[in-house]
Amino acid sequence: MIDFPASPTLNQIFTVGTASWRWDGAKWVAYGSGGSYIIAFDIPGVLTLNAVFAHVFAAAAAFPLHFGGSQARGSANATGSPVVTFARSAAASPLSFSNIGTMTITAGTTNPTFITASPPSFVTGDTIRGLVTTGDVSFADLYLTLAGTR
């Protein structure tokens, strides 16, 4: 018998052995069993303030806390610490975005740090947007892969 938590929070992940479930707000749903959902972005040139990139979800997808397993790099080290802020819009209100996390490139490197308050999840038609909220004069050619599950 599996003893699920009595008062789960939205998108909470519960694991027993090698199986995991995610609380969708109403029920526990098998997590990670539906296959991968990979999003890739390639933003050429210097990472300038207010550059925008986005993806509209063709299927429901969930991502680990802090976009665990996701990767990013560039072709030139950052002088400062550029920041990309990620936001979500629901399919029903595609122009209304709420921030869900950030990616910061450490100064002097091309190494990212992803931060989210909770594991992000999306339904079909939702949008994830990346907005450069702190640009950098030398970091260039951002390539980014967000790794989630269906």
Residues of each region from the PLM?
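Glycine-rich, low-complexity segments
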Residues: M1-F4, D24-A51, S75-N77, S81-V83, ...
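Extracellular/surface-exposed low-complexity repeats and stalk/linker segments enriched in Gly/Pro
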Residues: M1-T18, V29
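Exposed aromatic-hydrophobic patches
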Residues: T110-P119
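Short, charged beta-turn/beta-strand-edge "cap" motif at the junction between a beta-strand
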Residues: A19-W21, T134-V137
